[in-house]
Design a protein with these regions (language model features):
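Short amphipathic alpha-helix with an adjacent loop that forms part of the alpha/beta core around
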Residues: 212-218
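Cysteine-nucleophile active-site neighborhood
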Residues: 219-233
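RNA-binding accessory domains that recognize and position tRNA/RNA substrates
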Residues: 5-182, 186-211, 231
Length: 233
């Protein structure tokens, strides 16, 4: 449905903190960024992964080689929640892939992955040896890295030195559903699917900020969500 003009694409480098350099081709937003480089092994579900708040501050590397072939779904909301994404925007810093399919086909697709990245101002590189990159990350653990475009040098950035939970948590109290039971959900970077699952169990969900004092709440349960950053923090 959409075919990218491959001749006009810019080159960029992925530079790891140990000095390793991978060169790739840009298919997203053209801006130098830095963060923590991590890999994930799912074969499908890149719209969900990119919008997962747990990946805030991270440069995401799917191990599956071809990405983009089913495009990006159009947004639709139910009970105040996006049906096909895990939040209202992309949270990862950038996307690194092996092969990019600019042609896409799916009954619910609205745009290409590259178009979506550009709309959200998120860089993406393809043509990277993600197998070699994943092996390095598997051996050394998550590493700091940066995507560098010509003339846009930047420093490495460690997201774990900031309170990134505060950056992804809801700033306001929100309520979902009208179930029999009431659960206070402390939002440390919750995925929408967690809220969807609670709603299916006849639960009214009260979503509160990460630093909310819930000690005086009259409820049937407290749910502490997962989120980005080092769990030890």
């Amino acid at each position: 449905r959409y075919l990218m003009n491959m001749q006009n694409l810019k080159k960029a480098r992925l530079v790891l903190e140990d000095g390793t350099i991978f060169e790739g081709t840009s298919f997203g937003y053209e801006k130098s960024v830095s963060g923590e480089v991590v890999f994930y092994t799912a074969m499908t579900g890149y719209p969900e992964s990119l919008t997962d708040p747990s990946y805030k501050g991270q440069i995401l590397v799917p191990t599956y080689p071809m990405i983009g072939n089913y495009g990006v779904p159009k947004d639709a909301y139910q009970e105040g929640l996006s049906q096909f994404f895990e939040s209202d925007k992309i949270h990862c810093t950038a996307l690194i892939i092996s092969d990019y399919s600019s042609e896409y086909s799916h009954w619910n697709s609205q745009k290409s992955l590259g178009e979506w990245l550009k709309d959200q101002k998120v860089p993406g590189l393809f043509g990277i040896d993600t197998r070699a990159l994943t092996k390095k990350l598997r051996e050394h653990g998550a590493m700091l890295g940066k995507i560098v475009f010509a003339g846009q040098e930047i420093d490495f950035y460690d997201p774990n030195k900031e309170n990134i939970v505060a950056q992804v948590s809801t700033p306001d109290i929100k309520e979902y559903g009208k179930g029999k039971y009431k659960v206070v959900l402390v939002d440390c970077g919750v995925k929408y699917n967690i809220i969807r699952c609670l709603l299916k169990r006849d639960i009214t969900v009260k979503r509160v900020p990460w630093n909310y004092d819930f000690s005086q709440e009259d409820c049937d349960g407290i749910f502490l969500s997962n989120g980005p950053g080092d769990p030890a923090q």
